[in-house]
Amino acid sequence: MFGFLRNWSEIGKLPPELREELEAEGVIFTAGKVGVVRHFSGHVPGVHSASGVSRYTGGFGFSTARVVATFPARGDAKLRSIDCPWDTDQGPARATITDKGLQIEIDLHGVDPAFSGSMKLNYKKAIPGDILEKLPATALRFRVEPVFVYRAAGVRPKP
């Protein structure tokens, strides 16, 4: 019982090792226990959704080297929706950072031809204007691994 409560209290926090990595890289901003709204419309082998909306708790952080966000699906607190350098500009996903938080939009067919539709993740956390000015970029494109899409859609990935 105590293990469950301890693990439950850790949901949404940035893992300590990730926080240490960001600090070593020159942390700009971190946010833990952030409300994340996932919009999923499309098909991933094992699930089809016309317009599914789910709420989660995650975290994100910015360092001088990269942007990273966690998406704890099915108890995996280390699952990352984004973890890439600021100069990344290729891939089926787009991250946008505004004063309202971090938004990620994924073109599922671009991740894997077996997928269709889109997935949007909205990390709702106010980001001060002075922090936005310090960021190397407020929009970028990046690659997404199919295993992330499976996990975020609630499907056990195929080996």
Identify the residue ranges that each predicted region occupies:
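Positively charged, low-complexity terminal tracts
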Residues: 2-10, 16-26, 73, 81, ...
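Anionic N-terminal interaction surfaces
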Residues: 1-60
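Phosphoinositide-binding peripheral membrane targeting modules
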Residues: 39-118, 124-126
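Generic intrinsically disordered, low-complexity segments enriched for polar/acidic and small residues
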Residues: 26, 37, 53, 68, ...
